[in-house]
Amino acid sequence: MSSDLAAELGFDPALKKKKKTKKVIPDDFDAAVNGKENGSGDDLFAGLKKKKKKSKSVSADAEAEKEPTDDIAEALGELSLKKKKKKTKDSSVDAFEKELAKAGLDNVDAESKEGTPSANSSIQQEVGLPYSELLSRFFNILRTNNPELAGDRSGPKFRIPPPVCLRDGKKTIFSNIQDIAEKLHRSPEHLIQYLFAELGTSGSVDGQKRLVIKGKFQSKQMENVLRRYILEYVTCKTCKSINTELKREQSNRLFFMVCKSCGSTRSVSSIKTGFQATVGKRRRM
C-alpha cells in the first residue's frame, strides 16, 4: 500500500533529501572568523579581573590627612625627639680628668699624702678634700666637745658599786643601798619605792640604813632592777649623760628630769606600785 501511494504521489523513498547549501559571501565569512577569534580571546581572560584605576577622590583624602600631620610637625618645631648618641667611656674619662686638672685637685691629693696642714681655715678654702681627712676632723671635734658620743673610753666613766645582798631567814638585806643612791644623785626613798614596785614586795629601813626586804632575792635580780631605774630616771635621752637632776613641781605634782650638760628637760612617769598578793588566813563562815 505504501509503495502504491508513493508511486501515485511520485515519491521515491530510496532517495535522500538534499540539504540546501548556504551561499557564503567572502566579506561576511571574514567577519565571522574574526568574531570567533575575538570571542575565544575574551573567554581566556574572562577569569581575570581588570585593575581598577584609583579615583582622584582617594588621592584627595590622602592629601587632606597629610596636611594636619604636617601642621603638627611644624607646631612642635624643635620639640621633635632625637636619639641620644651614647658617649664612649674613654671620652667621659678624659673629660673628667681634664676637669680635675682645672680644679687643681691633683695638688691637693699630693699634699694630703705628704702631711695635713695645721690650720683648719686654710683647709676649708681648698677644693676637694679627701673623705678620710674629713672623717678624722669630724671625730677630733666630737671628742673635744662631747667625748661621750664619740664612744671614747678615756672620758668619765659611770660606775656604781654592785649591790650587796644578805640573807636573814625569809628576808633579804640590801646593805649598800645608801651608797648607790648617792652615786646616782637620787633620794634613797625614791629608789626604795621603785625597788618595791618592781619586786612586788615590801620592807623597811633599819637603824644602820640597810633595806630589809620581805622575800628571798639574789644580787643579779637587784642589778637588773637598778639598770632599768638608771635608764628611766637617771640617763638623759638626748645626750646620754648621767649628770641629771630629778625635780618635782608642786603645781601638778609631776616629776621632771633636767640634764645639766645639755639643758634638756623631759617628764618622767610616776612610780606605780606593783601587784601585791594578800597572804593570810581566811575567816571561817
From Swiss-Prot:
Annotated region (Disordered), positions in chain: 30-69
Protein name stated in the entry: Eukaryotic translation initiation factor 2 subunit beta
Gene Ontology terms for molecular function: mRNA binding; translation initiation factor activity; translation initiation factor binding; zinc ion binding
SUPFAM superfamilies: Translation initiation factor 2 beta, aIF2beta, N-terminal domain, Zinc-binding domain of translation initiation factor 2 beta
Organism from which the protein derives: Saccharomyces cerevisiae (strain ATCC 204508 / S288c) (Baker's yeast)
Entry's Gene Ontology BP terms: formation of translation preinitiation complex; translational initiation
Main location: cytoplasm
Subunit structure, interactors included: Eukaryotic translation initiation factor 2 eIF2 is a heterotrimeric complex composed of an alpha, a beta and a gamma subunit. The factors eIF-1, eIF-2, eIF-3, TIF5/eIF-5 and methionyl-tRNAi form a multifactor complex (MFC) that may bind to the 40S ribosome. Interacts with GCD6. Interacts with GCD1. Interacts with TIF5/eIF-5. Interacts with CDC123.
Family of this protein: Belongs to the eIF-2-beta/eIF-5 family.
Zinc finger (C4-type): 236-262
Residues bearing the modification Phosphoserine: 40, 80, 92, 112, 118
Compartment annotation: Cytoplasm, Cytosol
Function description: Component of the eIF2 complex that functions in the early steps of protein synthesis by forming a ternary complex with GTP and initiator tRNA. This complex binds to a 40S ribosomal subunit, followed by mRNA binding to form a 43S pre-initiation complex (43S PIC). Junction of the 60S ribosomal subunit to form the 80S initiation complex is preceded by hydrolysis of the GTP bound to eIF2 and release of an eIF2-GDP binary complex. In order for eIF2 to recycle and catalyze another round of initiation, the GDP bound to eIF2 must exchange with GTP by way of a reaction catalyzed by eIF2B.
